[in-house]
Swiss-Prot record:
Residues 1-3, 119-610 are cytoplasmic. The keyword Endoplasmic reticulum does not apply. This is ATP-dependent zinc metalloprotease FtsH. It is found in: Cell membrane. GO terms for molecular function: ATP binding; ATP hydrolysis activity; ATP-dependent peptidase activity; metalloendopeptidase activity; zinc ion binding. It comes from Buchnera aphidicola subsp. Baizongia pistaciae (strain Bp). The keyword Transmembrane helix applies. Homohexamer. Its cofactor is Zn(2+). Its EC number is 3.4.24.-. Binds 1 zinc ion per subunit.
Amino acid sequence: MAKNLMLWLVIAVVLMSIFQNFSANNINNRKIDYSTFLSDVNQDQVREVHISGREMNIIRKDNGRYITYIPISDPKLLDNLLVKNVKIIGAAPEEQSFFTAIFISWFPMLLLIGVWVFFMRQMQVGGGKGAMSFGKSKARMLPEDQVKITFSDVAGCDEAKEEVQELVEYLKEPSRFQKLGGKIPKGILMVGPPGTGKTLLAKAIAGEAKVPFFTISGSDFVEMFVGVGASRVRDMFEHSRKVAPCIIFIDEIDAVGRQRGAGLGGGHDEREQTLNQMLVEMDGFDGNEGIILIAATNRPDVLDPALLRPGRFDRQIFVALPDIRGREKIIQVHMKKVPLGNNVDPMIIARGTPGFSGADLANLVNEAALFAARNNRDVVMMSDFESAKDKITMGSERRSMVMTEKQKESTAYHEAGHVIVGRLVPEHDPAHKVTIIPRGRALGVTFFLPKDDVLSINKNKLESQISTLYGGRLAEEIIYGVNNVSTGAHNDIKVATNLARNMVTQWGFSKKLGPLLYSEEEGEIFLGRTVTKSKHMSDETARIIDEEVKLLVEKNYNRAKKILEENLDILHAMKDALIKYETINSRQIDDLMKRKSIQSSNICTDDDNN
């Protein structure tokens, strides 16, 4: 289409240039009246005259040129010119041919008609490839041999994989289900945090199903033209009916499926009209037998309730973050293309990466391979995975950043305060590593690693986290005094305050207020939430909440302070170790907490991960 349009533009430019040339022969000659010409002749200013019919091209003695026309027959003109010794040159008048005259007269109209016919033909071109095909669906149909991903490439989400495997089996062998009265699900909504493998599952379905597979993003429906979204939905389902049974996959459906009548735009914006059309196509008067709609989102809370009901999305599959066994399987899948050293153990890596999604683990393996290549190794060692994990969890090292000895000492005391309080309060995650090498925005980082996957947190553990967060600030206060505390604890204070407020207002950990919900998470109006907010508490209750939050923070603040004051010798020893080695691991932290000296700066051993 682009080539055809360019060809038409070139033809139009050429024809217009030809048209301009017909009338541009004498564009440099100005026209004057006949009386001025006679005056120039009488004043002996004319040197040469070219006569062609009634048109005369005059050349003055000063080389000036102009054109004039003889209004009537002037029998004395030639005599006057001869008297003034003007050179007279005669020429036959130029006459346009009949075809040239017709062309010049009709060319503009023919050009307009040609442009109109061109666009009308393009509007009739199917497949969404025409110049005016704004309403054509952008869904791409993937050939069976194009998608190479299968269920063997998907790991860490066994329950979700079983659900979609049943769907593929139905498409391959529908009679086995139909003889028992079972019907194929019309829609499946895959829900889960980012990076857990929702889109990968859809690709695996495409690789296993052996049926036409259409894929489109939720943002591809709505554009700047009114009515385009609804038209694209109709066109997509129309194409799907022709090749049923088939699968339609809509990625990030929250872009078009947000709740109607909420947020900005009221009930008449283009997105809502697109959603209305999708609701009708999914379960309206027109049957869609054999069309299975699969959608993925990480924001199910903003979707319209009508979109989620049975008959449209019959199933909701939650794709959760992988547990330790799932992480091990995911790591093994990504390690297939990486040459590994003998000391690499996927289970140890999985144990040290709680909370990592499938995408995070893929990035971890890739970063480890890059570290090995950077160090000119032929295989990827366990130390490369450790360095990659540190980079992902704590940020990249900024060794080029210049820190004074005073800043290093202050940072070392700050991080040591976190570690000591974290090791001595109950039920806190063990400290895995601490460093005073600047990473990301932080001057130092303390990394706590849970022993097991965290499914829920009790009150004691939450209070221990608050105490540990204030450990860094308190270490500075004890060593340097209240007036010399730095701003390094800004984020620690923010996190601790939010934890304490949530404990009081959302999790029911306040005896005075009881197990009641006093605040809800605020939703963004652009994500389907209302603009207005209602207040669920009185001013007196708000005052009590502030008091309870303050009491909770002060309680754990004082506990952390007492712990550090009782272990000042460990605080000084850990500061010295951090300044000497810059980074210490969990085994070295154990030695320091037992008041033992440490000799080695080795921070990447297999024993640490165990």
